Amino acid sequence: VSTYVYGITRTPAPPLPDGLTGVGDPPRPVRVLERDGLVALVSDAPDDLKPKRRELLAHQQVLAQASAERPVLPMRFGSVSQDDATVGAVLAERAGHFRERLDALEGKVEYNIKASHDQEAVLHLVMADNPELRAMSEANRAAGGGTYEQKLQLGEKVAQAVQAREGEDAALLRRALEPLAAEISEGPDSMGWLANLSVLVDREGADGLLAAIEELGTSAPQLDLKVNGPLPPYSFVEKSDAAADATASAGAARAGG
């Protein structure tokens, strides 16, 4: 039976609720594998695992339970090894890397902050800040709305100003977070967001981070800020080759089997 890996932490094994289950239908019981002072949180791997909502939530729930009181290196959803022995071998082979990253994550949690513009507020802002745009808009109004070409030209200028403001406000958000963050990771670009930042912060400093985000939302009302956390530090595992090596070794072992 293949082994599904949720995350890695130090011994002793974290206290897990009785009957904790993970992925699969029916859900597989979660167990621990220990090697060289490290613990892998695992279960049997289902044969037909798909990234359905229930499975993703089960993966996250195991990590949430395990990381309540200590750092855990979270594996990405779908990390499967050939068997328990292969997981143990990876723990032994990469022990130094895992310990180094666990040290870096000690007492820390991740928050994800996404920012977008309130369209009405940002349009008001760029018009107020740009005399040329105001003059063009007023000229169009005085001419009964302006010609099609004039409207198109104004629209293009406004779009350029809004795009420039997106860059400015993305930098503004990062500057607000940097003094409070141990590390910042930029997430993938996605439509609708001008910034997608993950922040590694001391657990005790989380209130300060949230207060700074709230203050920014007040001082920059054109920003719509969405905060998610605390989360397992997914975004900061990949900065070390530790978790990547574990997953790659597991995948190679599975392919070889």
Predicted segment positions?
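An interfacial alpha-helical scaffold signature
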Residues: 1-257
